[in-house]
Amino acid sequence: MLSRLFRMHGQFVASHPWEVIVGTVTLTICMMSMNMFTGNDKICGWNYACPKFEEDVLSSDIIILTITRCIAILYIYFQFQNLRQLGSKYILGIAGLFTIFSSFVFSTVVIHFLDKELTGLNEALPFFLLLIDLSKASALAKFALSSNSQDEVRDNIARGMAILGPTFTLEALVECLVIGVGTMSGVRQLEIMCCFGCMSVLANYFAFMTFFPACVSLVLELSRESREGRPIWQLSQFASVLEEEEDNKPNPVTQRVKMIMSLGLVLVHAHSRWISEPSSQNSTSISDHEVTTMLDDMMPKRVEPSMPLWQFYLSRMVTMDVEQIITLGLALLLAVKYIFFEQTETESTFSMKNPIISPVAVQKKQIESCCRREPEQEKTVHVSTTEEASSKEETEAVIKPLPLETSPKAKFIVGDSSPLELSPEDKNTMFDLPEEPRPLDECVRILKNPDKGAQYLTDAEVISLVNAKHIPAYKLETMMESPREGVAIRRQMLSDKLPQRSALQSLPYKNYNYSLVMGACCENVIGYMPIPVGVAGPLLLNNKEYQVPMATTEGCLVASTNRGCRAIMLGGGAKSRVLADGMTRGPVVRLPTACDAAEVKAWLDSAEGFKVIKDAFDSTSRFARLGRLQNCVAGRNLYIRFQSKTGDAMGMNMISKVTEQALARLQEEFPDLHVLAVSGNYCTDKKPAAINWIEGRGKSVVCEAIIPAKVVREVLKSSTEALVEVNINKNFIGSAMAGSIGGYNAHAANIVTAIYIACGQDAAQNVGSSNCITIMEATGPTYEDLYISCTMPSIEIGTVGGGTNLAPQQACLQMLGVQGASTETPGKNACQLAQIVCSTVMAGELSLMAALAAGHLVKSHMVHNRSKINLQDLPGTCTKKAA
């Protein structure tokens, strides 16, 4: 209930920052000027002689006071240094200054409004500074700065207020009650200082609850600049702040003790102020005459001012003692160091840690002013460029942006780096291009001229030809004779048709070999999608270590899999075997009658029919060899499932081609047979199917490992008994209750998809490839060790063809030593990759099941997998176990 009230308060303050700030300032000014209506113009030392107790100030007191002031200034300095660690010094610094200033002004106004004596301000100021605690303000600012957008700032401030508000309220109450005890001491100086302390605590609390969140909300609302799709002031993600506050959450026992202590202090104050004082007054035996005389002596007496008021204040400001000079000097020195020197160090550190390499700035160059040269010359430039020169150019591209092209000279450069230095021969082959687009007829003649072509046209002219249908949009790469230039023009054409013209600015397209994409991977290309690639390992499989690449945007996945790999490594490694190898294609054919379909099925099931079809099947490819035919009849439809090895290729295209040849041979035997589709979903490809789970498709693999009890306890933070129990009730009973097909596992699809994307596989085939059953059993002499196995009957995978031809994907395959076709045995690399996938799935299963058994799943994903909040440097469960 209390948190809900504070949340509502935080939402209101963050939603109305101007109103709250103006209201706070107005209230402060009103309280400051309220005593002006009393007509009291008394100013001690100027027009009034105010009697006070003259006491000799000891040198030891001066030294102690000076040390106290210096400590207070250093304390404030270190408070702001802690704010700097958040990475946003200016926003938090300004907000912190606002907090300190408003707290000080409010304290002064309250005390002045209550007509209290201000002579103790000099002594109380250090204690006032020492009572300022910016940790709560810093924590609230973290909530605001963890927002992904402007709209989330208010909600996150409200959440932060709901978490921090009750704790801060209790702490402020306890501080006031504890410090307030000093106001009952009877020692005048101590009473004044404690009064200031209470006012300071209340002022800080008031500013924290009203002024500070409003300022933070307003500052972030006015900061519209963004970087890489997120606000430039964003520090981390919201889950990191939640995790940090969860770890720093006060002990409930301590909170109860504070509440009990507060209640006790309230009773002490009530007894001292309302019960003890009357009795003590009654016990005094001072006569009325003595009291009157004492009061007359202490009353201020009016005198004639000896100087103007402004001169009086100026003299008070100029007159400084030695201890005040020392204090002021230290404050100025630390201020200069903080503002000037540490600013440079911070900016340098952040620029080294987070270099902003924005392809957007490079791409802002007008495409019309881009110039081109012959593709042969482009290749010459890149071939002749040394590795050192390339490294130097890339470094320069990070430090400074590319200059805008101002000349229409044909000088087409591929990549985000600075333009490479051209050889004299290349420069001599350049040609001038017109700045204004030429007529359409002239552009058509240049395009059709065999000696010229599209490279003699500007981008604007090419776009006009595409709009006039003289150049098909899908042929831009081939017509331009430079795939990257075709992609750039397509991006410009598409940008004009999008709701937001700058939508493609953050989608990169440079530094990519599109010649490998054309006709193989993608059409109508507008760029490429960078995906983070992590590594899990080492994975000890069949006595060989592997570093497994995983491309994913799901936090905690790689770290969790890495923990499983470590557990397998400490257990002696995993063993794996390929049970079967055969890609399938299941066409559907139609016969005149169901009896005819049954007759064809019987012929295919016979040895004679199988031999005829196999001869036709095998004659088409040097890799494809028909291993099995599986047939079924539905009415007059006949479904034939061809199963064949396909070497190191995944094999869908290969087996589709040979299936057509086999069907043509079948039609020769049965002329009435009509082929409806070469794929009749009897394969089955990219769809859940029991036939893949039972009969297998692609590579059928099994792997196993034994995890010692010590590793289960120390690395997986669980027990064998708990893991076996969760596996039975989750993976077996739970999947059966859900009617799952091949889903008797925890998250095999996670690992399969991540490896598939990294290694250039067909990501959609994770549907069938993720079929897996995970078995866990207690083993060992005392049945405390864990036996785990994963059986995956339909891993559709290959190391040649498709996305495996792209350089980044080839790099990931090379990490595993399975890139390309095997030079020893056809299909060896693909089978090895399938075993790696199965073993990595087992590692992921092991770690996730342990997290579930130990109850760590939610906490780890709060840290690593919260999209609205995309945490850093926090002790999350998965990284803690993987370390």
UniProtKB/Swiss-Prot annotation:
It is a multi-pass membrane protein. Residues 1-9, 79-89, 150-159, 221-249, 342-883 are cytoplasmic. Keywords: Cholesterol biosynthesis, Cholesterol metabolism, Endoplasmic reticulum, Glycoprotein, Lipid biosynthesis, Lipid metabolism, Membrane, NADP, Oxidoreductase, Peroxisome, Steroid biosynthesis, Steroid metabolism, Sterol biosynthesis, Sterol metabolism, Transmembrane, Transmembrane helix. It catalyses: (R)-mevalonate + 2 NADP(+) + CoA = (3S)-3-hydroxy-3-methylglutaryl-CoA + 2 NADPH + 2 H(+). The chain crosses the membrane at residues 10-39, 57-78, 90-114, 124-149, 160-187, 192-220, 250-276, 317-341. Residues 40-56, 115-123, 188-191, 277-316 are lumenal. Disulfide bonds: none annotated. It holds the Pfam family Sterol-sensing. The active site is at E554, K686, D762, H861. GO terms for molecular function: hydroxymethylglutaryl-CoA reductase (NADPH) activity; NADP binding. Its main location: endoplasmic reticulum. Catalyzes the conversion of (3S)-hydroxy-3-methylglutaryl-CoA (HMG-CoA) to mevalonic acid, the rate-limiting step in the synthesis of cholesterol and other isoprenoids, thus plays a critical role in cellular cholesterol homeostasis. Belongs to the HMG-CoA reductase family. This is 3-hydroxy-3-methylglutaryl-coenzyme A reductase. It comes from Xenopus laevis (African clawed frog).
